[in-house]
Regions:
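Conserved ATP-binding module of the ATP-grasp superfamily
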Residues: 300-305, 322, 326-329, 342-372, ...
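Phosphate/diphosphate-binding loops
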Residues: 105-130, 235-257, 359-376
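Terminal amphipathic helices with adjacent charged low-complexity linkers/tails
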Residues: 5, 9-50, 56-61, 67-152, ...
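Conserved small/polar residues in nucleotide/adenosyl-binding loops
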Residues: 407-414, 418
Length: 425
């Protein structure tokens, strides 16, 4: 969900919030290379998850609003709003950064264009565009959500960004901590991450800090009005987080409880001098980079399945052949089971590498020999580096590595003392 001062702003903020690699109303393909007419006609006629992007690409390709309406029956008002965004986009592609004066920047920011999207279209780094925008004195303002539909006067600390008008944020001078939420729920990043953020916020308040929550999911506990002292309902992007940090000036930012969504901002926040509380950026990278993590496991001489890391498709296929199928493939910089897959042969691995994941020097993948008939156990622990407290032991009822029906696997009983013994080893 997103909020803004107009449809175009809200629409583009919503697209940025989806965590689908979008920074606005992106094209489905590279600029000037569009789907063929038959594909567009089919996608416009039959509603689907990518329909709105086909609407935009049809406009980019020169289709009339009338033709698009006849296929989609989307109201003309919405189609005109989208066309206006495409018109601005075409103008931006022909612009350079010096042509973006204060009035022009203000206009396009009011229509929801993100710094990342603008920078992409004019061909400059996002950081350069951000600094240019600030030099032109174009900043977001924050409006408070009226939770009573104007029936009577109320003051909430529930805010969203916009451009133009009076800022209603009124930040305090109290000591404060900002907690970055988990954004949209999905496989591998579920509600448990949100609940961690909730407890982080409550703990900060108990310690005498003003807690600030940033999230964009209305279906979570973290966006309840009484969980934090101040709530910003915003996309979890570097632009939005840095803007909030600029106005609130927190003593520190917590990123480790929201899953992969805030963790991917670790480097940019650290580079900007933001004080990241808890697990440091290097430790986060060591646990998320499959190659670095593998080096640590080997150094500690821990037991593990036969495995290997790969930085390109050729290397992955070669190591898979050496390990032997079936194997479990995991990308770097993801949590939970997202983009993790069990592959049984070379053909399945090639499909996975081509369609499901990006493999590069900076994003190696891990290939593990799949353990058949294995029991999977989760152990939650807290340690100060010397002492270990076990918070809970959870045995999976499904086969390790892949969800299957309980009836396909006999019930097991794992004793807590066995787990403790293995931990001590």
């Amino acid at each position: 969900m997103s909020m803004g001062s107009n449809f175009q702003e809200s629409f583009q903020k919503a697209l940025c919030s989806m965590e689908e690699g979008l920074n606005g109303l992106n094209s489905l393909v590279e600029k000037s290379v569009f789907p063929d007419d038959d594909e567009i006609t089919s996608e416009l006629t039959i509603p689907g998850p990518k329909r709105i992007f086909y609407v935009a690409d049809a406009i980019r390709k020169g289709w009339s609003i009338e033709k698009i309406y006849s296929l989609t029956k989307i109201d003309y008002w919405f189609l005109d709003q989208i066309k206006e965004l495409i018109d601005i986009e075409e103008k931006l592609y022909d612009s350079n950064i010096e042509e973006l004066d204060k009035d022009y920047l203000q206009e396009i920011k009011e229509k929801g264009f993100s710094d990342s999207r603008i920078a992409e279209m004019i061909g400059v780094p996002e950081d350069e565009l951000r600094e240019h925008r600030k030099k032109r004195n174009v900043y977001p303002i924050y409006r408070r959500v009226d939770t009573c539909a104007a029936e009577f006067e109320t003051s909430t600390c529930y805010m969203y960004s916009s451009y133009g008008g009076k800022c209603e944020s009124n930040p305090t001078t109290k000591k404060k901590i900002l907690v970055i939420g988990s954004g949209p729920n999905r496989i591998g990043q579920g509600i448990e991450f949100d609940y961690c953020c909730v407890h982080a916020s409550l703990a900060m308040q108990e310690e005498g800090y003003e807690s600030i929550m940033v999230n964009c999911n209305p279906e979570t506990v973290s966006t309840d009005y009484d969980v934090s002292n101040r709530l910003y309902f915003e996309p979890i992007t570097s632009e939005k987080i840095l803007d909030i940090i600029d106005i609130e000036n927190p003593e520190g930012v917590i990123i480790q409880f929201g899953g992969q969504t805030p963790l991917k901002l670790a480097d940019v926040l650290s580079d900007k001098g933001v004080n990241i509380l808890g697990t440091n950026v290097d430790a986060i990278d060591r646990s998320e980079d499959r190659e670095r993590f593998q080096e640590l496991v080997n150094k500690l001489n821990l037991k593990q399945p036969t495995n290997g890391t790969a930085k390109n498709q050729r290397e992955a296929l070669k190591k898979a052949e050496k390990i032997g199928f079936p194997i479990v493939v995991r990308p770097s910089y993801v949590l939970g089971g997202r983009a993790m897959q069990l592959v049984n042969n070379t053909k399945e691995l090639e499909k996975y590498l081509n369609e499901a994941v990006e493999v590069s020097n900076s994003k190696p993948i891990l290939l593990d020999s799949y353990l058949t008939d294995a029991i999977e156990v989760d152990v939650d622990v807290v340690s100060d580096g010397i002492n270990i407290e076990i918070g809970g032991i959870l045995q999976h009822i499904e086969q390790a590595g892949i969800p299957v029906s309980y009836t396909h696997l006999r019930a097991h009983e794992t004793r807590g003392n066995l787990v403790c013994r293995l931990l001590l080893e």
